[in-house]
Curated annotation (Swiss-Prot):
One Gene Ontology molecular-function label: ribosomal small subunit binding
Species the sequence originates in: Burkholderia thailandensis (strain ATCC 700388 / DSM 13276 / CCUG 48851 / CIP 106301 / E264)
Stored InterPro entries: KH_dom-like_a/b, RbfA, RbfA_dom_sf
Family that this chain belongs to: Belongs to the RbfA family.
Coiled-coil residues: none
Functional description taken from the UniProt entry: One of several proteins that assist in the late maturation steps of the functional core of the 30S ribosomal subunit. Associates with free 30S ribosomal subunits (but not with 30S subunits that are part of 70S ribosomes or polysomes). Required for efficient processing of 16S rRNA. May interact with the 5'-terminal helix region of 16S rRNA.
Compartments reported by the entry: Cytoplasm
Protein name in the entry: Ribosome-binding factor A
Complexes and interactors: Monomer. Binds 30S ribosomal subunits, but not 50S ribosomal subunits or 70S ribosomes.
Protein's UniProt keywords contain Cytoplasm: yes
GO biological process: maturation of SSU-rRNA
Length: 122
């Protein structure tokens, strides 16, 4: 018997829905003071939907404390998602701080420094 595989498009649709729902649920349902203003940047699902890596940025607060608080609330958020999503398996949530913005700023700074050094040499 062959296993039915979900399409990549369905995976993306479910990840997008989880992203939208988590954004709302964190804002309305999670009362942990360590969680300030959080933006869910992306959600990556495993092919079997068992696990979801949730990438976030934090406008306020310490990112490490926010990550700890979100991972502490992951079980509660999982239960709330279960009530909203109409899928057989709601993934276990794993929150990760998204450092893309900081890395982009650092890279831009390095480029600016290299350009300034080159301008001095000319």
């Amino acid at each position: 018997m062959s296993k039915k595989r979900s399409s990549p498009n369905r995976n993306v649709q479910i990840a997008d829905q989880i992203q939208r729902d988590l954004s709302e649920l964190i804002m309305r349902e999670v009362k942990d003071p360590r969680i300030g203003i959080v933006t869910i940047q992306s959600v990556e699902l495993t092919p079997d939907y068992a696990h979801a890596k949730v990438y976030f940025t934090a406008l306020t607060g310490n990112p490490a404390d926010t990550q700890e608080a979100l991972n502490h609330a992951a079980g509660h958020l999982h239960n709330l998602l279960f009530k909203r999503l109409h899928i057989h398996t709601v993934p276990t949530l794993h929150f990760h701080y998204d450092q893309t913005i900081e890395k982009a700023v650092a890279m831009s700074r390095l480029i600016d420094e290299a350009n300034a050094t080159r301008a001095k040499d000319d």
